[in-house]
Amino acid sequence: MTAEMNKIPEAILSLEHASNDRWNRGDYHGFLESYTKDVTYFDPLTERLLVGRQAVEEHFEKFYKGVDVARSEYLNEHVILSEGRDLAVLSYNLRNYVVDEKHAEKRSAAWNSSEVYRLLDGRWRILHSHWSLTRHPAIVAKRAV
């Protein structure tokens, strides 16, 4: 990979981290600003594919307003770049930590994330976003029995 191509994954990771930092402070607009107008979106709370920034914003407002995450850990970050260098797929695992009532940090949700970015008018934008739980509680509970 050339030095120029190395800058693209760094730029995408920087955008993703900045959006997630805002999310952790209860501001989901960082992600909304990164989405294209016709973004497609899934997460564990969606019953169907959400299409369009407006639909995603309504979903965020309903389920994620006021999120408060103390910190996040990014694991297994991987960016695949198209030959044309205008399309990239970012995949990673995210561990979130919150502060409990005793002011102790504890692990919260663990996520799988896949984001499809496209370079549009000189700016990397998210075309598709898919979030899932890393280890779904129902599946983990069945295995523990």
Q: Model segments located where?
A:
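A beta-strand edge to alpha-helix "cap/lid" segment located at domain peripheries
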Residues: 2-33, 40-145
